[in-house]
Regions:
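Helix-to-loop junction immediately C-terminal to a conserved catalytic motif
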Residues: 48
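ABC ATPase C-loop
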Residues: 147-149
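Conserved ABC ATPase "signature" region
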Residues: 107-126
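Conserved ABC transporter NBD signature motif
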Residues: 56-67, 72
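Catalytic Walker B motif of ABC-type/P-loop ATPase nucleotide-binding domains
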Residues: 155-158
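A short, surface-exposed alpha-helical micro-motif characterized by mixed small hydrophobic
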Residues: 196-198
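Conserved beta-strand-loop-alpha-helix hinge in the C-terminal portion
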Residues: 210-231
Length: 231
């Protein structure tokens, strides 16, 4: 479970989040929506200690992220909106293997995870390809594969479908749905509910620095009040 309590966060001199509280259950498929600049990305980067709050707290499975950032980064997989922020290797297979290698797994298990992750995003044939030779959409899929290979308890994806073609979107959607069914928390940050509306257990809208709306219906007409188009 991820628990956010009375969170306050700043970007420069601007307060982005103020008094935000949120609880995300194991296995929940949560969509975080809101206008550009509302603080969605600032919020999710608190989940594994990439950003520190000014006040309040974030805990992952009962451990305060500020006190155990390494544990949080192991438990919370993160896929950034710009996939280039994720890459640490020049070749697809080496990049996806980086996370599992740092978990101290044996080579057989690492190879299994890398193969399964690349298969899930339709990139199994590109294991030996240099990342800089891939299209933007292919790079996005490699970034998702890198997070999947960690087999985290909680997976955060910031605009994960940007640049993906329809077959890749279907493949990624199927994998995310399966992960949620298996007990992994899946948190998707998006401006387009149509991508995941049928998968979401709950939709949270961030506005005014806090949770302005929670709903389990993508057709909820109140979404439009916050610049989110109902489905």
């Amino acid at each position: 479970m991820i628990t956010v309590r009375d969170l306050r966060a700043e970007r420069g001199d601007t307060t982005v989040l103020e008094g935000l509280s949120l609880r995300i259950a194991d296995g929940e498929f949560l969509v975080i929506a809101g206008a550009n600049g509302s603080g969605k990305t600032t919020l999710v980067r608190q989940f594994n200690g990439l950003l520190d709050p000014e006040s309040g707290s974030v805990s992952v499975d009962g451990v305060d992220v500020a006190e155990g950032p390494v544990a949080a980064r192991t438990s919370v997989g993160m896929v950034f909106q710009n996939p280039r922020d994720c890459f640490v290797g020049a070749v697809v297979g080496a990049d996806v293997a980086f996370g599992p290698e740092n978990l101290g797994l044996d080579r057989e298990e690492i190879d299994r995870r890398v193969g399964a992750a690349l298969e899930a995003v339709g990139m199994a044939d590109h294991r030996g390809t240099r990342i800089d030779r891939l299209s933007g959409g292919q790079q996005a899929r490699v970034a998702i594969a890198g997070a999947l290979a960690m087999e985290p308890d909680h997976l955060v994806l910031d605009e994960p479908f940007t640049g993906l073609d329809h077959p890749a979107r279907r493949s990624v959607r199927r994998r995310l749905e399966a992960l949620s069914a298996e007990g992994t928390s899946v948190i998707v940050v998006t401006h387009d509910l149509r991508e995941v509306s049928d998968l979401a257990d709950r939709i949270v809208v961030i506005s005014g620095g806090t949770v302005a709306l929670e709903t389990d219906s993508p057709a909820d007409e109140r979404l439009a009040e916050f610049g989110v188009r109902p489905c």
